[in-house]
Amino acid sequence: MNILVTGASGFIGSFLVEKALDLEMNVWAGVRGSSSRRYLQDERINFIELDLDDEAALTRLFAKAKEEFGAWDVVIHAAGITKSRFRHDFFAVNCNGTRNLVNALRNAGAMPRQFVYLSSLSIYGALREEPIGMHKDSNPFGSKGESGEFREVIYEPIRKDDTPQPNTAYGMSKAAAENFIRVSDGLQWVIFRPTGVYGPRERDYFLMAKSIKSHVDFAVGFKRQEITFVYVKDLVDAVFAAIERGVTKKTYLISDGRTYNSRTFGQLLQNAMGIKGVVRLTVPLWILRAVCAVAQTAGKFTGKTPTLNLDKYRIMKQRNWQCDISDAVKELDYRPKYDLKKGVDETVAWYKKEQWI
């Protein structure tokens, strides 16, 4: 099977490439000319430089590729940006880049049998944030454990068919890309909307590890927050389960199937890193918003993309990140192997091995 992975040099993209190689697929890694290839060292990888801003150039490139080896059977579109100094960049990269990619594949007569798009749970915005009180926690896997017991579940999960109400430029751009994909003639698409993805090589969650190492753990807002995560390898497994089954015209929400409070991630990092004496601070939302606004403004003058910005503020402000993954469980036999503790332990071990901490 011939497979193209866009954004292959990125966090998720590099793991997608590794999985495809493990499955003995013929892999093309779509990268920018300036992209680091640090995590793409396998000699079996075919590299193809993609300028997603230029539909005509992509069309010529894909037409040439088709002449050489035929069309790709599967295209996984993982390229995109999660933060930027300027709002319009999200739409230029995440939406217009997707449009250029699909149009170029069509124009070159190289439409794949399956086009996998990595979207985001952020397309929904802040939904279902009204308290519902005590509730029997659902267990999508039908196994024993902490799920299935009575506990305080404040919010109902976000469901696939909920109407997206994105409240960030990032979420809006991903929703716009989805809308284009769904109406594209001849495109056999499947869409994944993962919650927060963490693991080795990822740098945003790594900032929390740096903070813990400095003996400070931050939480934001005083209203209870229900958070979900998915370890990168579990997300990748879900993607390839869809590829194996030839799934098309389907959308899947992806998490590890569990729900955590705002302190769990920091506590697990602290335990895995062996850090003692951590001060836990809860920052009021108005202070967070002010800090994000200042950082965003400063970034426009320094030319650097800040980690904190008003988009990030809206994401951190959101209280409900629960999501219903039952479709993936039923249709893809999705069984995540990593709960948060196992994933954090493996991630911290990688941080230490790579001397990030």
Language model region names:
Residues 3-23:
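N-terminal Rossmann NAD(P)H-binding glycine-rich loop of SDR-like oxidoreductase domains
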Residues 50-96, 100, 121-129:
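NAD(P)H-binding glycine-rich loop region in Rossmannoid oxidoreductase-like domains
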Residues 77, 99-169, 190:
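Conserved Rossmann-fold NAD(P)-dependent oxidoreductase catalytic core, especially the SDR/UDP-sugar
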Residues 128, 175, 187, 198-207, ...:
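Glycine/proline-rich active-site loop of Rossmann-fold NAD(P)-dependent oxidoreductases
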Residues 161-164, 210-230, 234, 238, ...:
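A conserved pocket-lining segment of Rossmann-fold NAD(P)-dependent short-chain dehydrogenase/reductase
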Residues 232, 267, 293-334:
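Conserved C-terminal active-site "lid" loop/helix of NAD(P)H-dependent oxidoreductases
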Residues 245-307, 341, 345-346:
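Mid/C-terminal beta-alpha module of Rossmann-like enzyme folds, strongest
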Residues 323-331, 335, 339-357:
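Amphipathic terminal alpha-helices
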